[in-house]
Amino acid sequence: MIKRERYMSRIRPFIGTELVKVMTGIRRCGKSVLLELIQQELTQSGVSPAQFISINFEDMRYSHLQTAQALHDEIIKRAAAMEGKVYLFFDEIQEVRDWEKCVNSFRVSLDCDIYVTGSNATLLSGELATYLGGRYVEFVIYPFSFGEFLELYRSVEPDEPVQKCFQKYLLAGGMPYLANLRYADAPSRQYLHDLFNSVQLKDIVKRNKIRDVDLLERIIAYVIANVGTTFSATSLAKFLKSEQRAVAPETILNYIRYCCEAYLFYQVRREDLQGKQILASNEKYYIADHGIREAVFGGNMRDINLILENIVYLELLRRGYEVTVGRTGDKEIDFVCGKRGEKLYVQVAYLLASEETVSREFGAYDNIRDNFPKYVVSLDEFDMSRNGIKHRNIRDFLLTEDWT
């Protein structure tokens, strides 16, 4: 089991506190394993496993606990038979209707430490925010980074050079369970295809009561094909009209929002760096795991420049950056990244194969006058840094702990 220390280091300060620890992220990205890691650390610190109550609400053994009242009664009964603090671990809690009422009740009436996971971003909206009133901390969990993938893939192919490992990562992506399949091509594709279908059906169609599944599938296919490129709901509506599917831009935006809430896609807004304002249209979208894109739709190597962008974007999120696409005049910077008052700029390219490409990628920073770090990241093996702008091979960039 990989330790996922980047997440554990953030969660650890809150272990044992009254704050509810909420872990969200796309289905099967490793949230359940984090619950196990937390239990391991608690046990190592002297807490008896007899004080743990763990429930995975997708397990049929707990199908009778699908309402707040049923869950409340079960936990109160079990906690009454236990001594000392109770540690509650609820996996995929969105399956329980009105679950937030339970969590708040436990927090108030029990001496407990609560951890919950869910596969939808709306887990923390509306009702929960009202009931908990700021008494929770959220951790968004992502599929494996290249560094995490490398650690596990090397257990399967210990002598594989890092270049070959990265080629595998470009196609396989970072879903943790692939390690159990030893990253074999056909089983991995089947698993990712089935996972995609599960996210689409359970977390998007079923949750949002979507009737026009064909329309949803067309929108998802379009967004995935256009990962990392700017487009508007209006342009997508025109495309669908060409396929004899007339649909309002508002409907398209709703369907894309449902996909983002299920963590299938991430939206990146565009920012005018000179006017210091967020632009209202033509956002970019990236997929939660590029391996899903390859398994379901193919084309990762054909669209490698976009896939490299996708990989870098997810790595920026993992490290806690808020990310926008930057515009300065007629130039665009792939990622403008902010965290605790610090800023970082990242430009992603496939290969700097010509002077024209070099000029375009490095020239994106011509209008940026501050002294924050600026990177151009590509697959090139040799360093082409210039004018204070750092050039890095993408593998080295992803494996570097400190970019500042």
Regions found by a protein language model. Name each.
Residues 2-16:
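Pre-Walker A adenine-sensing motif
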Residues 23:
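Hydrophobic anchor at the beta1->P-loop junction of P-loop NTPases
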Residues 31:
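Conserved lysine of the Walker
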Residues 34, 38:
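Hydrophobic positions on the alpha1 helix immediately C-terminal to the Walker A/P-loop
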Residues 54-84:
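Short glycine-rich substrate-engagement loop in P-loop NTPases that contacts/grips substrate
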Residues 121, 126-230:
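Interdomain motor-coupling "hinge/lid" segment immediately C-terminal to the ATP-binding subdomain
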Residues 183-343:
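Accessory nucleic acid-recognition modules appended to NTPase machines
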Residues 326, 350-395:
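Catalytic cores of nucleic-acid endonucleases
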